Every structure is written in C-alpha cells, then in structure tokens.
Amino acid sequence: MRKRSFTLVASTLGLTLVLPSAGNVGAAELQALGGGGIAAPVKELVAQFENASGHRIAFRLGTTPELIKLATTGGPFDLGVVPREVFADPAAQARFALGPAINIARVGLGVAVRSGSPRPDVSTPEALKQTLLKAKSIATLPESAAGAQVLRAFERLGISNEMQAKTKAQKSPAQVVEAVAQGEAELGVFLVNVLTAPGLDVVGSFPKEVQQEIIFAAALAANTKEVDAAKAFIAYLQTPAATAIIKAKGMTPG
C-alpha cells in the first residue's frame, strides 16, 4: 500500500497545501484557492476526496486580500473555496465561472485566552466591550474577511480608537493562535474554529448583537480545463461525509 504524505509549502501569499494521491491514470490535478480559516477541514476534505476519486488537489490558502491577488494575478486555478468577500471584488469575481457560488461552511467570531488564564465574560455586548477595554493587548488579523468583521464589531461597540492602540496585527490565522499561546497578546479575537487550538482556551463567541459569520463559498474558475473534476470536488463538499468533517472542525456546513 502506498503511503500518503502531506506537505505545507510556504509562499508569498498564504500557504500551498499539497496532498498527493494514488496517481490513477487520467486523474486530474486541480489547483484551488482557499481561505486560511478553513485550513483544518480542507486538509481532511482533500485527503478523503483524493482517496475516493484519485484526483489530486493543491490548495493555496490565504487571507481575503491575498486570495483576490491570487485570483487576479496568481496564475491559473480550477476552483475556489473562499470567503464570500472575495467575490465582492469585480476583478476577482471575473476569474470565477458565471453562476452562484455554493455556500460550504460558515463560522462566527470569538475570544480566546492562553490556556489556564482567567476566562473573561463575553456573553453580552457590554461584557464583551468591558473585556476588550480591560485587555492589555489583543491579536487579530485585520487584513482578512474575519478581521474586517472584528473591526466592525469594535465600531458597533464604540471602542475603535481604544482597540487600535492595543491591537497586535498578525499576518495569518496561525500567527493569531501563536501570539496568544506564547503570551504575546492577552486575547485572541478571530474565528472560533481557528481559536480552538492547542495552547488556547476559547472563552466564548461574540454575542448575537455583534456577531458576524464568515461564509466560505465554492465556485469553479472561469477558465478551468478540469470542469468535471472540479465540479466533483464541489459536489463532494456537500455530502454527509464532508459536512461531518466541517462540523468536527468547529464550523457550520452550508
């Protein structure tokens, strides 16, 4: 039996996730774009799909601005599973096939602390506001769809100016986790599924009054030459097997 291996290759824009397949004759090699917030489920989803289909998929993961740049200037790709904010950019939207994108997963914002630290109250807008104001520092990822929603939440709470001075901007979801786990930031404020990581304790999701979910949607690239294989992967993402993985990684399918 051939052993499978996983390789993460750093790039100037996010990460490239390469998962080799069994190499069936005639199998497609797909290039895909993905939001960094779905890195954990994507790894398992691709592995399961490859085992069943024989196709190979290489995912380039990044923030929303990075994905827009990848879509418009990063070379050919076959499909994307990206935050819906990517499709709001006209140049990026033009690189995807006509027709509606299909919602695959969604997740809301939350707050985490270093494991073992006191767990502040974030259960109401006022409690969240006071927790954020009392924190000495927070880690988030402003240059992302989730980070933009964090900043909008600060605006709704009326604390934008105060938070600007104590925000330690990170460059990737993994760095948000690391900053809190290493004690470089008191709070992590980002997607709940990303914050659910070793070294962190999630203290709670944002209250519904200020909560905004990030929706990851799938769409074919306009110029893909592997239409059938790309469609097959998107169809697989909607199966019970795939939605079970999505749920297990702290996200809501659809």
Predicted segments with their positions:
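General helical structural elements
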Residues: 6-8, 88
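Exported/periplasmic ABC-transporter solute-binding proteins
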Residues: 26-93, 97-107, 113-254
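N-terminal secretory signal peptides that target proteins for export/translocation
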Residues: 1-4
